[in-house]
């Protein structure tokens, strides 16, 4: 199968620690890179991931809290210093463009490429915001102290592989192969019809990845998340700080696990840990008690979908 990897660059929350970096991830889907959130120091972690800056053209920002955007101006400046010439597309709430324009004008004077801002929807409905031949990206409505949304990456299923034995046996010409891959049947010169499923191997299933941070518990998103291969869900607090989670519109590890269980996802990864936890094992234990296939996010973790 073609590559679909998620690189965790940072999984901490607002207060800096020596253990975790602020929120940021890189998705490598068929060698095309997408960034989710860009906390302070994200470009350093990007370097450490050994992914190529040149393959990044789309950045998705969940919300306008500093621990999710303070690394953005530094990354954009570095790309200009490196001589980038092709556009960078940033998907964020509309206020980010207003905030970033003066910084770009001041710190990135003479920037070598265009920065294109795409305003995220503000209503409480999932919407398609990006579409190419390999993937679709949808918003996930979240509830936080400022407008916020997560992102659902849905890989488009690749075309099925042709059965070489049938192509040779039926002497199907080369020009017809693409249409067969796309679902066409084949009729021989003497009128015999061969159904498409006789001519191809079954196509591989498209994979999916969901990112939900920052948010309180949102069970109404379960239908949207149903069956995703990997769900990254914030777990800022444990049960010991459940009142604080309610107050700040964050989630507990148990709530993240409940979302994963009800949505019947393949794997849960929890992150966005509060700095008050020196050891996140307590969060992992609380989540695994509800959804056993849970991992702790950590910098450098690579998820292979």
Positions of predicted regions on the chain:
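Active-site-proximal loop/helix segment associated with metal-binding centers of metalloenzymes
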Residues: 17, 130-211, 215-224, 230
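Active-site metal-binding loops of divalent metal-dependent hydrolases
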Residues: 11-12, 41, 64, 95, ...
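Conserved beta-strand hairpin/beta-sheet module of binuclear metal-dependent hydrolase folds
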Residues: 1-49, 85-87, 151-153, 160, ...
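Cap/insert and terminal regions of metallo-dependent hydrolase folds
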Residues: 180-302
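Divalent metal-coordination and catalytic microenvironments
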Residues: 6, 37, 46, 63, ...
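Active-site metal-binding motif and surrounding structural segment of the metallo-beta-lactamase
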Residues: 40-91, 119
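A glycine-rich helix N-cap at a beta->alpha junction
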Residues: 108-120
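Local beta-strand/beta-hairpin segments that build beta-sheet-rich folds
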Residues: 9, 124-131
């Amino acid at each position: 199968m073609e590559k679909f990897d998620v690189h965790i660059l940072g999984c901490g929350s607002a207060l800096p620690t020596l253990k975790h970096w602020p929120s940021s991830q890189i998705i490598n889907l068929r060698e095309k890179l997408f960034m989710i959130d860009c906390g302070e120091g994200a470009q350093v972690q990007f370097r450490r991931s050994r992914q190529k800056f040149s393959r990044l053209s789309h950045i998705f920002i969940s919300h306008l809290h500093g621990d999710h955007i303070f690394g953005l101006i530094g990354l954009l400046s570095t790309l200009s210093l490196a001589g980038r010439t092709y556009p960078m597309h940033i998907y964020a709430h509309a206020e980010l463009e207003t905030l970033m324009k003066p910084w770009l004008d001041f710190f990135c004077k003479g920037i070598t490429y265009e920065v294109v801002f795409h305003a995220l929807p503000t209503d409480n409905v999932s919407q398609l915001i990006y579409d190419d031949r390999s993937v679709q990206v949808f918003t996930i409505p979240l509830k936080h102290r400022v407008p916020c949304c997560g992102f659902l990456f849905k890989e488009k299923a690749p075309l099925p592989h042709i059965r070489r034995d049938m192509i040779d046996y039926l002497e199907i010409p080369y020009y017809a192969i693409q249409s067969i891959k796309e679902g066409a049947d084949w009729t021989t010169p003497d009128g015999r019809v061969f159904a498409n499923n006789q001519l191809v191997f079954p196509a591989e299933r498209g994979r999916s990845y969901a990112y939900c941070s920052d948010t309180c518990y949102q069970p109404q998103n379960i239908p949207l998340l149903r069956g995703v291969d990997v769900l990254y869900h914030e777990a800022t607090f444990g049960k010991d700080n459940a009142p604080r989670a309610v107050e700040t519109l964050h989630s507990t590890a148990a709530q993240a696990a409940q979302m994963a269980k009800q949505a019947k996802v393949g794997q849960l990864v929890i992150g966005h840990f509060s700095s008050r936890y020196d050891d996140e094992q307590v969060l992992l234990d609380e989540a695994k008690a509800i959804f056993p296939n849970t991992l702790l996010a950590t910098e450098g973790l690579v998820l292979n979908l």
